[in-house]
Amino acid sequence: MNSMKRYIFGNWKTYKTTQEVKEFFSVLNQTKLTKNPDVVFGVAPVFVHLGLANQLERNECLVLAQDANYVMNKANTGTVSYEQLKDIGVNYVIIGHSERRKLFHESDELINQKVKTLLENKMRPILCIGETLEEYEANKTKAVLKDQLEKDLKGIDSSLLKDLIIAYEPVWAIGTGKTASSQTAQDAIAYIRTVLGLLSSKTIANELPILYGGSVTPDNVSELLAQKDINGALVGGASLDPHKFIQLIEAK
């Protein structure tokens, strides 16, 4: 792995009750973690648990949001704005997750607005991109990634990209138990850097954190993180178990 910081982020989706959130942080807070300044970790609970997670956290665990609305002070029933998140100390936000794209029909144009607004307000979007199984089998991975990056980052000043994090999540590997091989993940993320270099600069492309997401577990995380272009992981199921999450954080 290169010399950049390592990011381990857990996406809890719509799992965990209030009691389960308390139990998770009870275990995490009582664990003496290796204090490595180059490892950044956090979890993304549902909106109603963000305040609770912030109150319970005692081990430098970031609290992330799973989405954000890019408008403020408007009549948008059922959403939470970026400013409201920032107001409670949440600065990292997952944007464009494949489940948001598919289940909520989020377009690249909408995702672009969200990413742009977060960056302009000094927040850190975690932009998720990736291909479906059909696209993967048709050898369209590169075309899909290029198209998503061009649309999702359209009109965003390059100077703002220093706060962007990208998560490559092949849709066919999310929640399926299938994991892209470390080489497949490396190749895709290396290509993402190539496209970023064309859209911004080689310096930005080389310094921007890019994570892998898709059935990451304590058993495969070290091999994935050993790849030169992979700077961390966006983890689903394995992040729900505090003991497994700790293993992910402490992985060598």
Swiss-Prot record:
<feature type="binding site">
    <location>
        <begin position="236"/>
        <end position="237"/>
    </location>
    <ligand>
        <name>substrate</name>
    </ligand>
</feature>
<dbReference type="GO" id="GO:0019563">
    <property type="term" value="P:glycerol catabolic process"/>
</dbReference>
<comment type="subunit">
    <text>Homodimer.</text>
</comment>
<feature type="active site" description="Proton acceptor">
    <location>
        <position position="169"/>
    </location>
</feature>
<keyword id="KW-0312">Gluconeogenesis</keyword>
<keyword id="KW-0324">Glycolysis</keyword>
<dbReference type="InterPro" id="IPR013785">
    <property type="entry name" value="Aldolase_TIM"/>
</dbReference>
<comment type="pathway">
    <text>Carbohydrate degradation; glycolysis; D-glyceraldehyde 3-phosphate from glycerone phosphate: step 1/1.</text>
</comment>
<feature type="binding site">
    <location>
        <position position="175"/>
    </location>
    <ligand>
        <name>substrate</name>
    </ligand>
</feature>
<dbReference type="InterPro" id="IPR022896">
    <property type="entry name" value="TrioseP_Isoase_bac/euk"/>
</dbReference>
<dbReference type="GO" id="GO:0004807">
    <property type="term" value="F:triose-phosphate isomerase activity"/>
</dbReference>
<feature type="active site" description="Electrophile">
    <location>
        <position position="97"/>
    </location>
</feature>
<dbReference type="GO" id="GO:0006094">
    <property type="term" value="P:gluconeogenesis"/>
</dbReference>
<dbReference type="InterPro" id="IPR035990">
    <property type="entry name" value="TIM_sf"/>
</dbReference>
<protein>
    <recommendedName>
        <fullName>Triosephosphate isomerase</fullName>
        <ecNumber>5.3.1.1</ecNumber>
    </recommendedName>
</protein>
<comment type="pathway">
    <text>Carbohydrate biosynthesis; gluconeogenesis.</text>
</comment>
<dbReference type="Pfam" id="PF00121">
    <property type="entry name" value="TIM"/>
</dbReference>
<keyword id="KW-0963">Cytoplasm</keyword>
<keyword id="KW-0413">Isomerase</keyword>
<dbReference type="GO" id="GO:0006096">
    <property type="term" value="P:glycolytic process"/>
</dbReference>
<comment type="similarity">
    <text>Belongs to the triosephosphate isomerase family.</text>
</comment>
<dbReference type="InterPro" id="IPR020861">
    <property type="entry name" value="Triosephosphate_isomerase_AS"/>
</dbReference>
<dbReference type="InterPro" id="IPR000652">
    <property type="entry name" value="Triosephosphate_isomerase"/>
</dbReference>
<comment type="function">
    <text>Involved in the gluconeogenesis. Catalyzes stereospecifically the conversion of dihydroxyacetone phosphate (DHAP) to D-glyceraldehyde-3-phosphate (G3P).</text>
</comment>
<dbReference type="GO" id="GO:0046166">
    <property type="term" value="P:glyceraldehyde-3-phosphate biosynthetic process"/>
</dbReference>
<dbReference type="GO" id="GO:0005829">
    <property type="term" value="C:cytosol"/>
</dbReference>
<feature type="binding site">
    <location>
        <begin position="11"/>
        <end position="13"/>
    </location>
    <ligand>
        <name>substrate</name>
    </ligand>
</feature>
<feature type="binding site">
    <location>
        <position position="215"/>
    </location>
    <ligand>
        <name>substrate</name>
    </ligand>
</feature>
